[in-house]
Amino acid sequence: MSGRQKEELQDITLLGNQNNKYLYEYDKTILESFDNKHQGRDYFVKFNCPEFTSLCPITGQPDFAAIYISYIPNIKMVESKSLKLYLFSFRNHGDFHEDCMNIIMNDLIELMDPHYIEVWGKFTPRGGISIDPYTNYGRPGTKYEEMASYRLMNHDLYPETITNR
């Protein structure tokens, strides 16, 4: 199999661009995708995003999290630099932790239409409590829908020991 051809990459504008504009307000239009060259195979793609930041919608105080995004691609895949800039756009976005994770998942579903996706946020404690929202999706009417249900019910059977994120 040969590498990517130039025409396959024409919609990728952020990767390799030294003049990217960092947005400080939520903007899903920054997300870019490319074709999955291995559509006949199920496989996971996982992004570990340890520096996510958003704002509490009530107090305006910053919230910090590590976010884990895993998906089984279908036809499209998310380009990682656009994902980085997209996540950065939450910096001044005021929303609850649970909302942020669901917004991220919904935007990625809209962009890629994956077979399966899960987004797990592990937020640092505020007021002595850490919040770890987990959300997932499997394509309805397929084995991925069943997989999503199973993973949701079993996602935290062995919770980690929280010392001090």
UniProtKB/Swiss-Prot annotation:
Substrate binds at residues 78-80, 97-98. Its main location: cytoplasm. GO terms for molecular function: preQ1 synthase activity. InterPro entries: GTP-CH-I_C/QueF (IPR043133), NADPH_dep_7-cyano-7-deazaG_red (IPR050084), QueF (IPR029500), QueF_type1 (IPR016856). It comes from Macrococcus caseolyticus (strain JCSC5402) (Macrococcoides caseolyticum). Catalyzes the NADPH-dependent reduction of 7-cyano-7-deazaguanine (preQ0) to 7-aminomethyl-7-deazaguanine (preQ1). Pfam families: QueF (PF14489). GO terms for cellular component: cytoplasm. This is NADPH-dependent 7-cyano-7-deazaguanine reductase. The lineage of its organism: Bacteria, Bacillati, Bacillota, Bacilli, Bacillales. Belongs to the GTP cyclohydrolase I family. QueF type 1 subfamily. Pathway: tRNA modification; tRNA-queuosine biosynthesis. It comes from the Bacteria. One of its GO terms (biological process) is queuosine biosynthetic process. Its EC number is 1.7.1.13. Keywords: Cytoplasm, NADP, Oxidoreductase, Queuosine biosynthesis. Gene3D superfamilies: 3.30.1130.10.
